[in-house]
């Protein structure tokens, strides 16, 4: 902890979070535990008094700034003339003043941490999405989602892919249909990507994996799904 004497009534200190832990306090305690927060503050005041002969008498004006590595605290005492009319009740409010200030400060710091965590989570999600997209572009299996049977039928009547190049499965889960296509090793990646793009004209991307679908969904069609759908649901407009 670094202490700087500003003048007769004001001191400034900076304490790192590692210093806080070295004194036997957890950072979380300072804003979740009233008793520990007050204990921490008065321990700091004892050190300040020992080093700078800064005796606490009467109300304090405290300003706290939370930084990435620690906390800066500026403490100012009332001038002598301010103490004349000070009551015992004013003294009793000092502990509450200290605790409330610590609570507000570390709540603010906690909010900053939450914001950092949120941004980090967004960054991680973006990285995961990018990785999933790269994986999709290099996989021989694609999975899409149809919101209802009508979308499946519409796609089936449009699709005219050569069926010996892939195997496919149609799953049903909670009235939603998932279509998985396994492409043969002879199919190049560009063709797979083009087929996926065509699928997305009728279907939607999904984060459901084939392992998940095998565990929780029901296979209702397999092997040349589009042909089966056309057979069961012929195009009456033709």
Swiss-Prot record:
Residues 120-139 are annotated as: Disordered. Residues 120-136 have a biased composition (Basic and acidic residues). One of its GO terms (molecular function) is protein-macromolecule adaptor activity. It comes from the Bacteria. Pfam families: MecA. Homodimer. Belongs to the MecA family. The N-terminal domain probably binds unfolded/aggregated proteins; the C-terminal domain interacts with ClpC. NCBIfam families: PRK02315.1-3, PRK02315.1-5. Enables the recognition and targeting of unfolded and aggregated proteins to the ClpC protease or to other proteins involved in proteolysis. This is Adapter protein MecA.
